[in-house]
Amino acid sequence: MRSSLTILPKWRSAPLNLLYRTIHGNPAPASAPPSHLQSPRQQRQRRTLLTLAIETSCDDTCVALLSKGPGPLGRATLYFHQKITSDSTAYGGVYPPIALRSHDASLAPLIAEALSSLPSAAEQARSDDEDKSAKGGGGGRGGNDLKRAGSAPNNNTLTIAGTPRQKPDFVSVTRGPGMSANLACGISTAKGLATAWQVPLLAVNHMQAHALTPRLVSALARQDSTTSPLSSTTAIKPEYPFLTLLVSGGHTQLVHSRSLTSHRILASSNNIAVGDALDKAARHILPPDMLASHGDVMYGALLERFAFPDSFPLSPPPSSKNSQGQHDYDHDYDYEYAPPLRRVEEIAPYTAPSPYSWILHPPLYDSRALSYDFNGIGSEVRKITTSKGDSMSLGERRTLARATMRLLFEHLATRIFLALAAEPELNDELQTLVVSGGVASNRFLMHVLRKMLDVRGFKHVELTVPPPALCTDNAAMIAWTGMEMYEAGWESSLSVHPERKWSIDPSGEEGGILGVPGWRRRQP
């Protein structure tokens, strides 16, 4: 069976501030019981749900509007999706006071802009009627709203610039983990909106949202026949269980996801995260003029472009798709990478080619512990560049950049194989490896993971990565997580507070996703 890496081309290079919308309706499923025989909750779930979402866990101020049709096959529509990143370039990294000030200045204007993108009351009423007709029902809220759309506003609408628009059914927001003050900015705003609109609040876990992002992408794209071969009648992918490699500037975790709220951490970082390690290595490796001219502090992304300057075409060539419509990185980019075939090869030191004379050691090369450690290689990179000084040529810097990323990414992969060896039962259910978080946008990482999975006997495992705009922090993933938690019957108390640390693993100090106080079952 041919190995695959799923990434939806529609999202590959699209700017973040575009509005993404699906355009096809659902096929008619089996008839539902008449509306007068259903509970209020069943009737609510028979219509399209809409949420406004806020993400402020670090230095990105993000707002999104997302809707989803009823049921597990409901279509997803992203009406608004924007973010503003604080400018911390003068500090060489994220500077909390600057990030907080940016949230204070940016969040309200973004929300005001998002409200103008709310679906009109008439448009949503038509959508509700279509959903009800498809379910075998009739009448109800949709028809009534359609009649009233041009008249006085009702409890289900907001008047924005004189136009009746659908009011969100609930507000979603990041509760943690993250910077406490930054989280509080978003949570306070979300509480205010939920109170003013008299709708529920969904305060969700940031890492859970990263893990669920591919399901959001599946729900958004599976209805568009021009970009996806998947049918609107298929379940949202990936289906549980699956493995998730969460890689960002703040976290590095290998997670076994068994359900919406059941996630077990198999391996995690002992110190800094892989994204932080890449940023720090980039500060030492990249030429000073390149660092000075870069417009933000995402130096890890700049390191990839520096290491592989020919690997960034404006758009992927059409021939880069395989027979399933998935992108084949072997065809897209020639990294000249040969994966280690055995453990003895993956723990061998990297010796720089002549005329260079330095060595890099793989992280934890002398240990089989289920953990990640990125400090050691960072120290070696710093020593190499310090000893060379200004005499280090561009070619040597590029060689060091490639070797550094290679060893970091192989380290990520080795813990996957060690975890599978420690729990053979995981091999039987492993069909999908999700890679999510900011570092997942690194194409060389995807190439290394795919190659290593293939040579270790896992060609059948689908490697799924969100498009770059959804790898980094964003509010769309928060909206989707809120949507899934809401449909599962959960909501948050208005008394919830930020969680600086909040593990998704139930064995953690916080007790997992549902272990923190404030969750409650929605009333029917």
What are these regions (language model features)?
Residues 47-167, 173-177:
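N-terminal beta-alpha supersecondary unit
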Residues 142-159, 305-433, 442-454, 514-524:
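A contiguous, well-structured pocket-lining segment that forms one wall/lid of small-molecule binding clefts
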Residues 173-199, 217, 443-453:
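Short Gly/Thr/Asp-enriched flexible loops that form oxyanion-binding sites at enzyme active sites
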Residues 60-67, 212, 244-246, 252-256:
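Short beta-strand scaffold segments in enzyme catalytic cores
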Residues 485-524:
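Acidic, glycine/GT-rich loop-and beta-edge segments that sit at the periphery of enzyme/chaperone cores
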Residues 1-49:
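N-terminal mitochondrial targeting presequence
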Residues 199, 204-242:
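Conserved phosphate-binding catalytic cores of ATP/NTP-utilizing and phosphoryl-transfer enzymes
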Residues 203-204, 432, 449-478, 492-496:
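Conserved phosphate-binding/catalytic loops in two-lobed NTP-binding clefts
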